[in-house]
Design a protein with these regions (language model features):
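N-terminal transmembrane alpha-helices
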Residues: 11-42, 46-47, 61-76, 80, ...
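Transmembrane helical elements of multi-pass membrane transporters/channels
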Residues: 21-40, 177, 209-213, 217, ...
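Small-residue-rich hydrophobic transmembrane alpha-helices
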Residues: 53-113, 151-170, 283-347, 384-406
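Short runs within selected transmembrane alpha-helices of multi-pass transporters and secretion channels
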Residues: 74, 143-162, 170-178, 202-218, ...
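Transmembrane alpha-helix boundary and packing residues in multipass membrane permease domains
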Residues: 26, 30, 42, 79, ...
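Short alpha-helical transmembrane segments in multi-pass integral membrane proteins
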Residues: 1-23, 81-147, 194-253, 309-379, ...
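Interfacial/gating helices of multi-pass transporter permease domains
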Residues: 44-64, 130-137, 199-200, 243-251, ...
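Helix-terminus/linker motif at the lipid-water interface of multi-pass membrane proteins
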Residues: 31, 35-53, 123-130, 187-197, ...
Length: 461
């Protein structure tokens, strides 16, 4: 797509069409990303070994901690680039692009080193037992220690491409990696590797897929750099200004904090559920995979909407910006309600993707727990979307303070305390219902923060 078409997308295209143009590829890539992460659990579940499932689930929070790094550099840099485009400063944005790219490289390498040094203690804190430690360590070694730089930099590249209007190309890279992983998983797990090494095989397949996605997105970013505000050239890195770094961090840090806080919440959830038993832990691991589907749609829609809101915020077109916010909110709520209906009606069948519905013994009990947890937790979907929607709108307009306040209150003051209280009162079911209860309360805060920001006309200059 040429530059003049990008201007049409941001300035004159009907708002609904513009949102869909930016969001649909993003949603697709988010869903494929979820599916290929689910694929590991699906194929591991085919082994009939609940300890392997629990081991992979325990490694998930360690992997998800890579998301804050991607958000720091990707959303922080991408949001700033969109605002600079709206202000007519596209050429100056190349230094922001380069700073985001190399910042991601540096931070991801540091994270990989830290996990390499402290993997076993971290996994024990997460709830790994003697039965699950081996599998958790195998998955963490390949997917996190070796894979983090490729995952993080790919995420940043996709954010940068999306925020300059190249949403389809950004999604193609991430989606391609996901599809490849789904193809490699069964090949590695059941053909190339011996029985008992299924978790290791799945992890290696994921690593290879992430490397290929990284190579594709890097090639795309280099190719579009001559006709866009994007660049990964070291020469442009030299031109970055301290003010630009500050602006990246003002939005990027709150964006990084939220998934990091969710990781803390997942640690609390896993540790609390592990007290109730390995089967309950395995069941919750399946549910947290499935509930990422409505999350992926909500996040994809919000991320697709972000550059449109950011561009028109900076250009001063408040009417178009507000229209994008309203229409994006309606789309997300309708989708979330549809997900609730799907999960409530087909909970057992969806859980059965990971475990044989005709199984007996431990597998059957795990399935029963998972179906029950899923029906309880899916009620959070519309409230989760409202939280994501408001947060991404604030990020688009550069309100890092509001985003940070919301993130801390949502997780540390509302969700985690509710989790601990409800666990003490209702046990494992209390842990399940803590998510919809927490998201419901957080949504009120999110909407209030967004409306408060929009009532400041001086901020829209």
């Amino acid at each position: 797509m040429k530059t003049d078409n990008k201007k049409e997308l941001f300035e004159t295209m009907p708002v609904t069409k513009a949102i869909l143009t930016l969001a649909v590829p993003t949603i697709i890539s988010q869903l494929i990303n979820v599916i290929y992460n689910i694929a590991d659990t699906f194929y591991v579940g085919r082994t009939g070994n609940p300890y392997m499932i629990a081991g992979v689930s325990l490694a998930l929070p360690v992997f998800l901690m890579t998301l804050p790094i991607g958000n720091l550099c990707g959303i922080g840099g991408g949001s700033l680039i969109s605002r600079m485009m709206g202000a007519g400063k596209g050429k100056e944005a190349k230094s922001v692009s380069a700073a985001s790219f190399y910042g991601a490289v540096l931070l991801s390498l540091i994270y990989s080193l830290l996990i390499f040094l402290f993997m076993n203690p971290i996994l024990r804190v997460l709830g790994a037992s003697a039965d699950t430690m081996e599998f958790s360590a195998q998955y963490t070694t390949y997917v996190v220690i070796w894979g983090t730089p490729f995952v993080v930099v790919s995420a940043v590249e996709s954010h940068l491409l999306r925020n300059t209007g190249y949403s389809a190309l950004a999604s193609a890279g991430l989606s391609g990696g996901g599809v490849l992983n789904m193809l490699l998983d069964p090949l590695f797990m059941f053909v190339l590797f011996p029985k008992g090494q299924e978790v290791k095989a799945a992890a290696i397949a994921t690593l290879i897929s992430n490397i290929i996605a990284f190579l594709f997105l890097t090639m795309v970013l280099i190719r579009v750099s001559n006709r866009s505000p994007l660049s990964i050239a070291p020469a442009d890195l030299k031109n970055v200004k301290k003010k630009q770094i500050s602006q990246i961090c003002s939005v990027g840090i709150p964006s990084a904090v939220l998934p990091g806080l969710f990781d803390v919440a997942n640690i609390v959830l896993n540790s609390s559920m592990a007290v109730h038993g390995d089967l309950q832990l395995a069941a919750m691991g399946i549910v947290t995979k499935l509930e990422r589907i409505p999350n992926a749609v909500g996040i994809g829609l919000s991320q697709g909407m972000l550059p449109l809101v950011a561009y028109n915020f900076s250009s001063g077109n408040r009417e178009r910006m507000n229209s994008a916010i309203r229409k994006g909110r309606r789309m997300g709520i309708v989708t979330a309600v549809c997900c609730i209906i799907l999960f409530e009606v087909f909970a057992k069948q969806l859980v059965g993707i990971f475990l044989d519905t005709k199984a007996a013994g431990e597998a059957a009990l795990t399935l029963t727990f998972a179906a029950s947890f899923l029906r309880m937790r899916c009620a959070a979907s519309p409230f989760q979307f409202l939280n994501y929607h408001s947060s991404y709108c604030l990020q688009a307009m550069g309100d890092g303070k509001g985003t940070l306040i919301h993130a801390f209150c949502r997780i540390l003051l509302i969700y985690i305390p509710l989790m601990l209280i409800l666990d003490r009162i209702f046990g494992q079911n209390g842990l399940a219902v803590s998510l919809p209860a927490g998201e419901f309360l957080s949504a009120f805060l999110a909407i209030w923060l967004l409306r408060r920001w929009l009532k400041k006309p001086h901020e829209l200059k």
